[in-house]
């Protein structure tokens, strides 16, 4: 396909249904399939509608959860042997100072959800995660939708299908897409806390999927819950993200 033909293709935004909790894996898998199938020219962009956050941990405990966007800043945490300083800048995270020296400082910077930097001896870590998902279970694609692309989408791991009406993919309205993109650009505002101590919940993703339990503690600043779940006949506290459970 010539460059002129590619430019003439009409591309619209579509919502793709994906496996909940696997939104980023679905995106990465789709990009690989597009490359293998030679269909990259049909697609302008694939995004997960969520905010990218940096989670910084020290000695096994979460210390900070910060936006990957915004002004450059250095974050220092005290690990097992001393201080590790992470720098968040231009959409990347790297180590600028560590008690471990060059071993950790020279680690490659990270910039994508799922990537992490670990200073093993000092037990400190920075990881990029997707937080405050606008539409859990969906990713967005700007593409010229045709039969070849539809077949590629449907055979991609963790991706199900586009939102359809009458058996045909339905493009999103431009104003809807702009609202979503603006939310991501500004930083998604956390939704109100919908859980309280004593709520009965069902786990909908992760290793405890389909287990039920009772909310013991709510941590709104981290968007996490401590849920008491019966495991092998014993009530066990399990820490879960808000997105991993639903009320019953």
From Swiss-Prot:
Gene3D superfamilies named among the record's database cross-references: 2.30.30.30, N-utilization substance G protein NusG, insert domain, NusG, N-terminal domain
GO biological process: DNA-templated transcription termination; regulation of DNA-templated transcription elongation; transcription antitermination; transcription elongation-coupled chromatin remodeling
GO cellular component term, pick one: cytosol
Record SUPFAM superfamilies: N-utilization substance G protein NusG, insert domain (SSF82004), N-utilization substance G protein NusG, N-terminal domain (SSF82679), Translation proteins SH3-like domain (SSF50104)
InterPro entries hit by this protein: KOW, NGN, NGN-like_dom, NGN_dom_sf, NusG-like, NusG_2_sf, NusG_dom2, Rib_uL2_dom2
Keyword list, A-Z: Transcription, Transcription antitermination, Transcription regulation, Transcription termination
Domain characteristics, as noted in the entry: Contains an N-terminal RNP-like domain, a C-terminal element with a KOW sequence motif and a species-specific immunoglobulin-like fold.
Quaternary data: Monomer. Homodimer.
Family stated for the protein in its record: Belongs to the NusG family.
Name assigned to this protein: Transcription termination/antitermination protein NusG
Organism name: Aquifex aeolicus (strain VF5)
